[in-house]
Amino acid sequence: MDVYLDNAATTYPKPSVVPNRIYDYIVNNGGTSGRGAYEKAMLADGLVFQVRKRLAGLFNHLDPKTVIFTSSVTESLNLALQGILKPGDHVVTSALEHNAVWRCLKTLERDRGISISIVPANAQGETAIEDVAAAIRPETRLIVFTHASNVLGTIQPIAAIGDLARSRKILFLVDAAQSSGVLPIDVQTQKIDLLAFTGHKSLLGPMGTGGLVVNCEEDIHPLISGGTGGDSAYEYQPDYYPNHLEAGTLNVSGIIGLGAALEFLETEGLENIRRKRTAWWTTP
């Protein structure tokens, strides 16, 4: 019997409800979201919005319309970083970041003239809040941290960093690729302004799904521009969410699969799933 251990890359197998729900949508509906007023399109609209609501509930986010769907956490992080940072801005980040953050920051350093401070980690991969505070400058625009390292699995003190960032009026972006679906995340109490997540890891959804939770009033410049299904005579991207940051046809089948996975997680309970995982690693 094969044993699959590559869950930090993507989880497998998915709950059976995920492929079943995707198949049912493709075979029995197939309509696209935001592109029509006929029955199948309206049904697709409703299904997509239900997944926004489920994600908002999972992360204790107040407005489902500002749960933005993307193709991956990499796109979500690029959307936030490229959409916010301007020439002269300073960013504080950790030494444990994935290339989805690091390469984007280095590109912005080269192309836009931002500056970057890297907060070191100790031998256990832990970051001290005092070191984060010491890295802040007058021109610091944003702090971006991974919640859990994809290499070490170390959990970073995002609640403390969120308190620090909010007290200094600095935006706080969290990369929750490895933690969403594993650890409790509350964008309100942890003071997270922007939360980037993927659907295909511990949220148990299909590849090609991800998102950005926008929990702030920041004007984020769209990463791409294009059709949104409405305001077609307007020459620029609409200024309201989610259309402001979503251009092109959504991955409706993938989003519906992610919704099925979220239903599974709600039924099982995150804490119950965590206990099972812990038991696997601690059983002699």
Kindly label every feature range from the protein language model.
Residues 1-284:
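Pyridoxal 5′-phosphate
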